[in-house]
């Protein structure tokens, strides 16, 4: 079951992703070690597909490569460049999906201008879609059938952290999600609803945001706009989960919320959502591989 391995809840003012990621990775390493000891040894392969010059995507790819090397997962990048055509992108995804040597595929978003991500995601095999963004996986989530899906790692990371801060039972809690994007906001809306939370969906243009947020127990921000969430918009009892990533000219990475907001708890950027997201992606890889190999998979 996708949620059975989620860490137990505990209140904390410093919502760091690494301690939770370490718990997830212990299980991932155990499976990878067992495969490495087979005769012949089995090593899963993860492929990251780029079709843009987006700086944040480059950061994510570098992070994935480092983690894969440490784990013993084969990793390669297919960089089609910002000038890639829709046809070339879709053909690449079809070929990777059909390749038995490839076990996980990540399409790095956003794509270059003119490319259709929704159309491209249709060409990733559901069991290789370790980012959980294909229509097949998202439809299962929206239908409340999470155990059958590969859940998107970033929104799942957000939900982990909310449960860690507010308790395992999210029923009745009020959560504002700022940013209705494909990778975080949209799937998170359904994933929180599946756990009984009451979700208010906002965007960067929401009027009188402070008034909208006042009644919430938690605020999730995932727009991709540095400094979007400010002190005057939050309440002392809020838990703030910052899923934004913005690379400044200096090369520093910052979130969508200003740091050290006057709230009950907040995730830092970097160090909050990111480490846990990476761990959950590899957990999805392991689960997807088991489905592909016909091995038993926990519901």
UniProtKB/Swiss-Prot annotation:
Catalysed reaction, written as an equation: (6R)-5,10-methylene-5,6,7,8-tetrahydrofolate + NADP(+) = (6R)-5,10-methenyltetrahydrofolate + NADPH; (6R)-5,10-methenyltetrahydrofolate + H2O = (6R)-10-formyltetrahydrofolate + H(+)
InterPro entries to which the protein is assigned, alphabetical: Aminoacid_DH-like_N_sf, NAD(P)-bd_dom_sf, THF_DH/CycHdrlase, THF_DH/CycHdrlase_cat_dom, THF_DH/CycHdrlase_NAD-bd_dom
GO BP term, pick one: tetrahydrofolate interconversion
Keywords, in A-Z order: Amino-acid biosynthesis, Histidine biosynthesis, Hydrolase, Methionine biosynthesis, Multifunctional enzyme, NADP, One-carbon metabolism, Oxidoreductase, Purine biosynthesis
Binding site for NADP(+): 179-181, 245
Superkingdom, natural source: Bacteria
Any one GO molecular-function label of the UniProt entry: methenyltetrahydrofolate cyclohydrolase activity
Pathway note: One-carbon metabolism; tetrahydrofolate interconversion
EC number: 1.5.1.5, 3.5.4.9
UniProt GO cellular component terms: cytosol
Listed PANTHER family: C-1-TETRAHYDROFOLATE SYNTHASE, CYTOPLASMIC, C-1-TETRAHYDROFOLATE SYNTHASE, CYTOPLASMIC-RELATED
Subunit: Homodimer.
Family under the similarity heading: Belongs to the tetrahydrofolate dehydrogenase/cyclohydrolase family.
Function as written in the Swiss-Prot or TrEMBL entry: Catalyzes the oxidation of 5,10-methylenetetrahydrofolate to 5,10-methenyltetrahydrofolate and then the hydrolysis of 5,10-methenyltetrahydrofolate to 10-formyltetrahydrofolate.
Full protein name: Bifunctional protein FolD
Gene it is expressed from: folD
């Amino acid at each position: 079951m996708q949620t059975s391995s989620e860490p137990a809840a505990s209140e904390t003012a410093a919502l760091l992703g690494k301690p939770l990621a370490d718990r997830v990775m212990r299980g991932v390493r155990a499976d990878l070690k067992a495969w490495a000891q087979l005769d012949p040894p089995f090593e899963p392969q993860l492929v990251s597909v780029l079709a843009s010059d987006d700086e944040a995507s480059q950061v994510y790819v570098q992070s994935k490569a480092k983690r894969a090397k440490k784990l013993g997962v084969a990793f390669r990048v297919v960089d089609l460049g910002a000038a890639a055509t829709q046809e070339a992108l879709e053909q690449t995804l079809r070929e990777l999906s059909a390749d038995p040597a490839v076990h996980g595929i990540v399409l790095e978003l956003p794509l270059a201008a003119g490319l259709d991500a929704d159309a491209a995601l249709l060409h990733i095999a559901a069991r290789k879609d370790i980012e959980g963004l294909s229509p097949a996986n998202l439809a299962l989530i929206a239908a409340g059938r999470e155990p059958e899906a590969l859940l998107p790692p970033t929104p799942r990371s957000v939900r982990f952290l909310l449960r860690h801060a507010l308790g395992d039972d999210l029923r009745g809690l009020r959560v504002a999600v700022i940013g209705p994007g494909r990778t975080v906001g949209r799937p998170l809306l359904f994933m929180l609803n599946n756990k009984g939370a009451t979700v208010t969906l906002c965007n960067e243009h929401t009027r009188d945001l402070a008034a909208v947020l006042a009644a919430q127990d938690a605020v999730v921000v995932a727009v991709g706009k540095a400094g979007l969430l400010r002190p005057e918009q939050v309440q002392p009892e809020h838990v703030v989960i910052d899923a934004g990533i913005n690379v400044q000219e200096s090369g520093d990475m910052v979130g969508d919320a200003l740091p050290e907001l006057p709230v009950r708890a907040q995730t830092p950027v970097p160090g909050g959502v990111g480490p846990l997201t990476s761990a959950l992606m590899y957990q999805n890889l392991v689960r997807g591989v088991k489905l592909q190999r016909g091995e038993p998979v926990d519901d």
